[in-house]
């Protein structure tokens, strides 16, 4: 459990708190209210101080019984890794993921971002044009939930790992459990809303999972901090995937994954039609 590894982390309902596991945190089924204390991260509060306030929060359900998206609780995974491995979360991911996959320019943290000679600056809308804005450092504090710096080349390598092309680095024994449904959610909870063709939505371990049209088990996640938008979707069975990175808060990010999936569906339809000729 989380409290057995991190005894200084307390919860208001000690019975539920003592049941809370890493799996609950990663599958967004902690039982705490949606986005518990994310606003404190927005306000640039120290991460340790935010965690110390978890003891004041009422659970809305027992752990494992309901879905509610979290960033702070999710980031306890990093504290557990540090406690168990003796390595910081950032160093651990570098050693276990970035290096084996050859993600040579991927890193964590604002200092690494600023040290890169080839970095994209964030942009926000100002009227009908995009203007540069300062990097917001707040979310680098919750590294498991945010804070990766990576190029599209890095992310293409990560994508290949996720669809099983690099089993020397990410074996199926790792991929299958993290990409499988753990916590079911509703159209009101699932990020996609009520969208035609989207069905069977759930959260895995760090990933959203859904069916689309006649195809099953798409895996997806997106990101949004001031001046940046990202999306990634893939299907290991179909051996397809797409990564979208933008140094702006473009509206295109809201629809890009479904435009990609629709293109794939049309290609499948064309292939089926060609076989019938």
Language-model-detected regions and their locations in the chain:
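The feature captures the short pre-catalytic strand/loop hairpin that immediately precedes
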Residues: 48-60, 126-140
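Residue-level recognition of oxygen-bearing side chains
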Residues: 1, 72, 154
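Well-ordered alpha-helical segments within folded domains of soluble proteins
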Residues: 73-78, 156
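Catalytic loop of the DD-peptidase/beta-lactamase superfamily, centered on the K-T-G motif
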Residues: 45-46, 82-95, 99, 117, ...
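Active-site helix/loop module of the DD-peptidase/beta-lactamase fold
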Residues: 1-33, 37, 55-58, 83-122, ...
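Short coil/turn segments at secondary-structure boundaries
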Residues: 38-41, 67, 109-113, 190-194
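Mid-domain, small-residue-enriched loop/turn segments at the edges of structured enzyme/sensor domains
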Residues: 21, 72-73
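Second-shell loop/turn segments in exported
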Residues: 10-13, 36-41, 62-66, 79-83, ...
């Amino acid at each position: 459990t989380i409290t057995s590894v991190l005894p200084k982390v307390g919860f208001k309902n000690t019975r539920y708190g003592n049941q809370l596991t890493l799996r609950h945190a990663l599958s967004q089924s902690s039982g705490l209210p949606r986005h518990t204390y994310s606003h404190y991260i927005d306000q640039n509060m120290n991460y340790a101080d935010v965690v110390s306030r978890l003891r004041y929060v009422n659970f809305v359900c027992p752990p494992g019984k309901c879905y509610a998206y979290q960033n702070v609780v999710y980031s306890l995974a990093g504290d557990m890794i540090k406690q168990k491995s003796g390595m910081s979360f950032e160093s651990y991911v570098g050693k276990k993921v970035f290096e084996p996959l050859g993600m040579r320019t991927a890193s964590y943290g604002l200092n690494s971002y600023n040290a890169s000679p080839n970095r994209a600056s964030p942009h926000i809308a100002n009227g009908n044009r995009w203007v540069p804005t300062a990097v917001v450092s707040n979310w680098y504090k919750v590294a498991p939930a945010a804070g990766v710096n990576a190029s599209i080349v890095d992310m293409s390598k990560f994508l290949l790992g996720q669809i099983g092309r690099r089993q020397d680095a990410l074996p199926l024994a790792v991929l299958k459990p993290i990409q499988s449904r753990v916590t079911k959610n509703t159209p009101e909870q699932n990020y996609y809303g009520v969208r035609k063709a989207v069905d069977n939505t759930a959260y895995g371990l760090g990933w959203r999972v859904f069916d689309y049209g006649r195809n099953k088990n798409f895996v997806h996640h997106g990101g949004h901090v001031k001046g940046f938008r990202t999306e990634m979707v893939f299907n290991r069975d179909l051996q397809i995937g797409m990564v979208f990175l933008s140094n702006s808060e473009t509206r295109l990010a809201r629809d890009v994954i479904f435009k990609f999936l629709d293109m794939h569906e049309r290609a499948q339809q064309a292939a089926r039609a060609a076989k019938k000729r």
